[in-house]
Amino acid sequence: GANMNKMGYVGEVKSLISELMQYNVRPDALAEFLEKEPLGEGLRLKMQDVLTMYQGFTEYLKGRYITAEEVLELLYDVAEESELLRNSVIVLDEFTGFTPIQNRLMEKLLVLAKKVSVSVTMDVREDFYQCRGVHELFAMSKKAVASLLKVAELCKVPVEEPLVLPTGKQRRYANAADLYFMEQNLFRPGAGSYRYKAPEQSMQHIRITSLKNPREELKFAAREIVRLTRENGYRYRDIAVVTGDVQQYGNYVPEIFEQYHIPYFIDQTKNILFHPFIECIRAILEMIEYDFSYESVFRFLRCGLAARVVTEAKNSDKEPDPAATEDLTQQPETGSHGLTEQEIDRLENYVLARGIRGASRWSRPWTFVMPDGTLEDMARLNEIREAVYENFKPLLEAFRGKDNTVSTQTYELYSLIRRLDMEQLLKERGNFFEAHGNQARAKEYDQIYKIVMDLLDKVTSLLGDETMTIREYSDILDAGFEAAKVGIIPPGNDTVTVGDIERTRLNHVKILFFVGVNDGVVPKAGNQGGIISQFEREKMAEYHLELAPGAREKVFIQKFYLYLNMTKPSERLYVT
């Protein structure tokens, strides 16, 4: 109970329930496990709490919604009805492993399909069917092979002899003996030392550089990319940048790559929590919670989407202040068709000077004329005051009424968003970014309104009849905003891909920049967080309850991903 209000706790519970679903551990199976197995008292009580939440969650959703984790289970139920799957040829490429729920679906696919081909990454010198432990470099691949063979045996489906592709020396590494040697020896027991004949040819395809910070690393990469494309004829699509911390390095990529005119695509889903639209909604709720405090009011008015809280200025024929004019090559204009930045400044000065706080002060006319002001200025300030208060009044009343439900509160929030014409403002911003060549930002603005509307719909559907305080309501929306992501598709074919060593899938890469190869980043430091500890996971595994890999196993998994990335480029590897 006390943990419920801790930052990130809801996310941890969500992750654990998602994990249980992915690994096909249903509430009844978990309940049976807790009843039969002699777990320690602490772990038992913890998992009992998890079971209570898990049961409540699944019971509440029954007949209303399905989770993303249940999609494969539904496909399993209807797969036999699909003409597309029957007698088809299915190819599974670049899978590093399969969860229990995926293996369950494979049972149907093996029976229905004419042929199923699965590719795995493994050294031809390895025993494909024997794994001595998670410490082996190709343990994930061997585990995937073992699970597929088990499914095939269960379904009585014959398994063909494995097709082993030729080694890289004759193909990818024909002109890069040093890269081929690294691929054959990296993380292998008894690895040898590279020997070369001519010093000038030594390690010419592998370069290790030390730089002082992420910005300098990316500047180095950008300069090399420009040189390689201009002098050596490489295309941008031949080049990729990977890192163990795409969140940090991704913050510097737009500025640096645009400075060097390099087209790029960052392969990550972006958190929306700090998007201007989300910031605006959070400011709106803060105004209600803190009763029109100075800080909350101007957080809202300066969020960039509050321009239409008031109609266009009557004195719009005045010349704009050149000092306040925005550089339209950088940001879209936000003050058109309504409230301007100059007016917000004047309003803020007046509110500060008069100490105006509280909705009641905003509901009554302001009469004091500032020494440097005019009656016309005062009339405009009152026009803005009235527009702000009248727009917010229905939402204010929705949260002040004791019997008002979440459905009523959400409807009034939605109505305010509509009155402020935010959907149109977001479209205008998206069009601006598209016109200025920033496709990623344009796509972000295209998606954000629908994401928020879907969240409000879900809140209404799930909690519509509940009553709650403004703080509880804000926390629920924040949890939804924190979980929501914006996905961006590549803007074109000829771009440099910037990605994560685990998530990003690279094909036909000739040159790879591996940046941020530092302790704690590659491999990542073990995450000690989570509801279930590493020890508890191992304890549960002893009793045959399979969950996602723990911190110890993840270290070896990262080593495998490190191998995959460092052996991707066929011609040059840069490590910084």
Please report, for each region that a protein language model flagged, where it lies by residue:
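Polyanion-engaging groove/track-forming segments
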Residues: 1-576
